[in-house]
Amino acid sequence: MKPEDFRADAKRPLTGEEYLKSLQDGREIYIYGERVKDVTTHPAFRNAAASIAQMYDALHKPDMQDTLCWGTDTGSGGYTHKFFRVAKSADDLRQQRDAIAEWSRLSYGWMGRTPDYKAAFGCALGANPAFYGQFEQNARNWYTRIQETGLYFNHAIVNPPIDRHKPADEVKDVYIKLEKETDAGIIVSGAKVVATNSALTHYNMIGFGSAQVMGENPDFALMFVAPMDAEGVKLISRASYEMVAGATGSPYDYPLSSRFDENDAILVMDHVLIPWENVLIYRDFDRCRRWTMEGGFARMYPLQACVRLAVKLDFITALLKKSLECTGTHEFRGVQADLGEVVAWRNMFWALSDSMCSEATPWVNGAYLPDHAALQTYRVMAPMAYAKIKNIIERNVTSGLIYLPSSARDLNNPQIDQYLAKYVRGSNGMDHVERIKILKLMWDAIGSEFGGRHELYEINYSGSQDEVRLQCLRQAQSSGNMDKMMAMVDRCMSEYDQHGWTVPHLHNNTDINMLDKLLK
């Protein structure tokens, strides 16, 4: 069965229950040396799956529908999440921004690869299907399916960190390549990284990132959609923070790890048949190379990414304030200044999301794209911001992050709880249970394995740091902004020379220059 076949009503997206059922398809997921029978019930994945299901359920709640949903443009007569339909104006983008934010608040910004992330790919297919040449109709069909059902896509576009100094066609034993062409489709083998949360998705888009060297063998120049239950598709998962949290603690100890862990996995394809209707680019280096700049996804996904980070920083800012109140340092001038800096970082990303929408630019077929300069700024600044904010938290909360008991179980032991009540209480009348709860939440956010992974995630979210900054420079050059800035400097320098001012409205200093008088 296809995911859309689980819907009781074809005019609406999946519900949470239908989403969970659609994952029970025999997909080949491995963790801790064993194959997972059902990701919706396995302790390594079940709470993350339930958290995504909650997002699907929100699409059908009357009090959230106005913010989250609007009608489809496919002729189905149904409705969908706003970011699953192509924006046709700046106001459409603003409404999409608000829908993204509302959905993200369900995970407090801690789930990044939610269904709306790759909805940007679906919209790119729908807005510019002609880019895919002979596979134009495939692009149109996928846009319709993604939009009407709310299909959960991920992508795997980065090659494994093996021999990256070589072109793809010189690492044939590792990177995904064409094995064989058949009447039914293409057969592919190889691996990709990192397939974040793919264990809980319906499909993976396989392609190339912008910073990778492709080589000359067209058997590597592919882009296609792989169902997660396709024979030969395998995910080898990293350790599950959710499962570790459940096995060694409780929600009180690990309130984020235990429900929002988007497991990153090694994606292996072992002679996988990809039907022709799932192929988007086939043995076409030129189109693969142009996809990043012309395909549209790279211009669309940063809106979701920026808004999701802004929501996350709302949460972190408030949690930092609570943590400082625990320790009694929240009124110190220097501490308040650091908290103010975190607020400024938070404000910047909300402002960038505003700019992406208000300065939106027309694209093809009536579609609108987020402002390019704003999204490039987000991509450059986000890694800097996250690392700086984490450092501010560590410098200001200090030992409060680890001056904590091992587990909620300690609170149930009267022999030690009496000491915890006295020596681990909060400031200004806060009891020890509340203080420990707040600071364990902060530790899970930045200090646990889950928290450390999130720092790595935010720093590398948009790919190579050099490439991200180079793209920002290229955008300034291609848009003409660099020429305008250069022209301003040239105009300034043209207004004077070694003899004085060259413009008529300024007065030369020959009448007051002391050196002229002294050296006569």
Regions found by a protein language model. Give the residues of each.
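N-terminal-proximal low-complexity accessory segments that begin disordered
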Residues: 3-58
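Generic structural signal for well-ordered, non-transmembrane alpha-helical segments
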Residues: 46, 50, 144-147, 311-314, ...
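Internal helix-loop-helix
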Residues: 57-153, 203
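FAD-binding core of flavoproteins
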Residues: 155-308, 475-519
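Charged/polar positions within long, soluble alpha-helices
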Residues: 158, 325, 351-358, 387-394, ...
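Extended amphipathic alpha-helical segments enriched in small hydrophobics
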Residues: 304-362
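Short, charged, amphipathic alpha-helical segments
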Residues: 336-340, 368-376
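Alpha-helix capping/hinge segments and adjacent helical runs
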Residues: 373-516
